[in-house]
Amino acid sequence: MDTVGTDAAAASINERRFAQSTSPKVSVKSQDSLFLITYSNMQQTVVQASLADRYPSLKKLNILLYIDIPTIDYYNDEMTHNKLSRLNKRFKLHRLRNSIAQSFSNTSTAEDNDKFWEELKSLISSRSTPENKFDLNVLVSSSGSLRYVETIRFLVEKLFNSFKDLYVQKKLNLCFQINVSPTSLKWFSTFLNAELLNLKIINWQNIGSFTKTIQNSKSLPFKEYYTKLNEKFTGSNQSNGSMQDQTVLDSIVIVTNSTGVKALLTLLSDHPLTSLISQESIKALHEYSDAVNEDKGDDQSNTSLKRNSSSLLNFQNSVLTSNKDKSVRIRSLSINRKSNRAHMFKTNESITTIPSTSINNLIGQESNLRKQPSGTALHLQSHLHPHSRSQSYSSSNMSRSPSPFPYGKTPSNDELVYDELNNQINEVQDRAKNEEIVLYNNNNYDDYTKERGEQEQDRTSYADEYGFNYDDEEGGNEDNYDDDEDDDDDDDDDDESDDEGLSFYAPSILSRSGSSTDVLSSGIDSMAKNSKETRGRFRSLSLMDPALQKPFNQKFPNSQQPDSAGASSPKRSTSSNHFTNVYVHDGDFDGTDTINNKKNLSSATLIKRKSLMNRNLAPSISNGLIPPEFISRISTPSTSASSSNSSLNDMSTVSNAFSKLLNDTSKKQKFLNSPIPQHTQQASPLLMRNNSNSNLLFEKNLINKSFEELRRQPSVNLFSTLMNGNMEKNGLALNFKSRTPTDALMANSIKNSNNSSHRLLNLEEEDQIMSGSLPKEREDDNDSTNSTIVPNHPDNDNYNDNDNDNNTGINSNNFNLNLYDDNDSAGFTDVTTEGVKYSNSNSTVTKPVYKKAVTLDLYGEDDMDNMGGWVLGGNAR
């Protein structure tokens, strides 16, 4: 009886001891941008006891590992992506493998973890038999990515090596179930422990591509562990009773990112949070959340803006969410001109502009912003102050800020526009008491003066903690984290300093958004009334007119100046009749001119300055926009004296002037022999050469000179020679003769003519090729193109008759034209001049004409006489 009573008393004592144990809770740990979520019903007792004493009925242990990192899972293993190296650096799962192995036992230290596995092996060795084995099931659920194989291999081989002896003794049923893809399965079959593979205790679940699994399969890592945890958190399963009655232990380990943690908190939102998650984990989550918010706040307020796209876009995205990842970068060839940078001055601290209307409207709509500035407003305020080293446009540090020009020096040499800017700044300061923007600036300035010391301390501490260097503005920040190296590489191209150029980005809430409706006003009076609201220069880059909701209309009416000085000044013509989707305006929207308000300036100075402003603001097209490939001497050889274009133009001019005379022989001859008209005698400078008292203003008029000399040609019938006096042909056409009679004619004209008319006869060969010769002559030329010697057919009388009939009014002098100036040109000329004789009796003695082989003188080396001719490769001049 005493023994029975003693055993009952011992059992009651053990129940009270183990009843003081804590209930199962979820623990969360963060490491390397990843989170380790652990749930286990292995309860830790207040009084230390062995695993066999705590769980006398234990027969099964389930270890469930879920790897859910969507950033990695959605990339295929076979895909080569430029961000994979960055992902591998950020999500280094192999750094968590020791923590994952320790989480299987739900222990806090490595010593407790080793003690747990030793006690479990002792429990299996003492209780299990080949007939009654202990079950150890390990499930690894993931997307099967290659980025997980090293960690999975480490965990599986560690468990196998620990329980290999018990498995050989047939006291343990060891089973692994691993989700793999075809690529990761190939890797495991190659690099996993050969002994483990030969035992065939691993059940490979080939899920294929993870993207296909998302579409087709209902079993995903997130859904699986969500369901498991939900079952553990239900009320019926939460009261597991005494530990001595437990036969199965579950250990759920989840590796995920911040998205998975948010999903867990959403899952626990319907339950008392403190009863399901450990107090240490709640504290750790709060610290992590505060650190993230602090980093975001520091990025918005303390981090200086750099002259690169990523820094400015990050700042804009925090203010205006509609312009994310949209960077507009505009560079102009005329960016260095004074007219483009006259209305903006750059200091060492910031780029300052004149106050605009948008800030006034913003302040008027948000009155609470002036009374109690919010955190975002304070962050924006820190960017707008000069000490922030911002390279973006600032609009709130205008009226009360000191002069940005040190020692009276300006970045631009245009002192006129600088005086105008000073005048505008003085007028804005004079109207400070009547404008709302002054109140806003006063508040900001007071806050700035009070908090400047504190902000400098915060900036110093922030720089000391994170390694930022605010003095080096162009160098960029160097992070100590591995995952930011690729970000720096992406921004290297945009990190170059551009001292001369300016970069305009997508407009944010700080930029001035002007509208063409500000210009379209009913009259001068209304514009004068609204001058306080619309006065001030700005520069905006927008795609649409915010007021009209359509592309900007750049057609503005010319405002009439009320004073005499404005009326006497040149009219300003800046209107254009086209619409554009990019609107850049730099000028006053009101009709009044701030320069005219200065009474101490003379009208001449005002006119001079207004003309300078009109010239600067007038739209112009730069010649630099024309690519150099469109300016080529080969494509535009019209500057050459003997080019084909100039020759054809001269011939067309002559043909148009004497078209009627070419069709009537009698009128043509009468005109050529007629005296010089009286008005021509008075106007022509050629007739006044002997008069020393006359003023020869038009002595070099080539048009009059050419026509005077043309009318003084009594012997050479130019039109019957060059333009074919055969009336059967079209008189308006350039009906040039074939080469042989033309060469003879022109050679004779050059030798015997005493005047300067031979220059008009110096025609190129391509002008002769483009002539309207007879069809038979064209056939003869085509047939003899490839031959070296082309004999004139003496038996064919028609060939000679046609040539002679067409040259009835030509002198019998011999003409010679050396187009190529070759060595054999003399012999060729002798044969030609001797064989061809022209007379009024149409009798001709012909000899074989030796035609030169077709050659192409590309660079004009053989053409010594034609020094002004255009050849391939450039002008010879």
Swiss-Prot record:
The keyword Coiled coil applies. GO terms for cellular component: cytoplasm. Keywords: Coiled coil, Cytoplasm, Isopeptide bond, Phosphoprotein, Protein transport, Transport, Ubl conjugation. One of its GO terms (biological process) is protein transport. Residues 369-414, 446-521, 550-579, 773-815 are annotated as: Disordered. Residues 389-402, 805-815 have a biased composition (Low complexity). Residues 510-521, 551-579 have a biased composition (Polar residues). It comes from the Eukaryota. It is found in: Cytoplasm. Residues 447-462 have a biased composition (Basic and acidic residues). Residues 470-501 have a biased composition (Acidic residues). Residues 412-441 form a coiled coil. The keyword Phosphoprotein applies. Interacts with ENV10/SND2. Functions in the SND pathway, a SRP (signal recognition particle) and GET (guided entry of tail-anchored proteins) independent pathway for targeting a broad range of substrate proteins to the endoplasmic reticulum. SND functions in parallel to GET in targeting proteins with downstream hydrophobic motifs. This is SRP-independent targeting protein 1. The lineage of its organism: Eukaryota, Fungi, Dikarya, Ascomycota, Saccharomycotina. The gene is SND1.
